A protein has these predicted regions:
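Acidic, surface-exposed loops and disordered segments
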Residues: 1-118
């Protein structure tokens, strides 16, 4: 995690998070479909990881590792990834440093059900 944290200023929390999940697509597997299908599946998996972490009382954040970005080569090197593996994203998971925010039910209301005070 220390090696990853050194790669981008937005990743400095990684050592404190305790866990990082790297989400990748094997571009040789599955049907021969456009790359977007692999990305869609990985993005859905990342969203499910975020939801599961929240359900377990953990904090989680989606960290982008875009193909062609400055962060991709060091990530590929740290994890020794072959060329056919495409890095889609990373999720830092750990115990949150602060209390969760107020639930959305406290500040989101269906149209017309909360008076504007006028």
């Amino acid at each position: 995690l220390e090696q990853l944290a050194a790669q981008a200023r937005w990743w400095k929390m990684l050592p404190q998070a305790g866990t990082a999940i790297l989400v990748c697509a094997d571009m040789t597997k599955g049907e021969k479909v456009k790359d977007e299908m692999h990305l869609s599946g990985c993005n859905a998996a990342i969203q499910n990881i975020l939801l599961a972490a929240h359900d377990m009382g953990l904090g989680a954040v989606w960290l982008g590792v875009c193909e062609g970005s400055d962060m991709e080569p060091p990530v590929r090197q740290i994890f020794h990834l072959p060329d056919h593996i495409r890095v889609v994203g990373m999720v830092a998971v750990g115990h949150p440093a602060c209390a969760p925010q107020q639930p959305a039910s406290g500040w989101i209301f269906p149209f017309g059900t909360k008076s504007s005070g006028k």
